[in-house]
Amino acid sequence: SISPHEKACYHHIEFPSYKGVEVEVHYRPSFLLCFWHNRKLQKYYESVKEEQFSHRVMLGEQGEIAIPTVEFNLIFQLTHIYAHLMNEGIGLRQLLDYYFVLSMLSVNCEMLTSLQKELKELGLWKFAGAIMYIMQEVFGMPASRLIVPPNEKHGKFVLNEVLEAGNFGRHDARNRFGRSQLGHNLQRVYRDIRLVRYFPAEALCEPFFRIWHFFWRLKHRSQSL
């Protein structure tokens, strides 16, 4: 344990606020709620980590820094947006981030074939199609920069979620269960029911992941004592 008051979860560690500044250390880029797909995602991150750590660019006159590759960000940012959809809500800021990732991409057939194969194996194909629909319809992204064919049905659903809920679901009038712990969990189930038609693997696994994560936190909290 680094300090007596940090809170660890599967994705990050929250440290106590220091002079009003919240500190959250991410030790895992992202995760998926479907256990099968998440296992593949973590293997993917493990396989490309050395490339990401060694990918360096010049930051003006400030020197050299390491940043992820565009190819990595295409998957990482997509899973980050997906997590927002499944858990609380997406804001336009996440979608705008993805627009700029796509804008930086130099498309070639070999890279696109590899990327599309990865998206299918990770269970992200339909969600990627939904995001491509929004990129084209809302942000005016040229078709030549889309990484998968746009999925209008799923895209319209996701766009409606963005407009109804906003970032972290702060503006979602459908939140009807209050802000208590019980209300929060009931709201998650209600959300899963709404999402299961479009993204069944993630929505069906969400309650089981939540139970698994509860015991994961208990186990790792006891190990840090």
Model-derived segments and spans:
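Conserved NTP-donor binding/palm subdomain of two-metal-ion nucleotidyltransferases/polymerases, i.e.
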Residues: 2-225
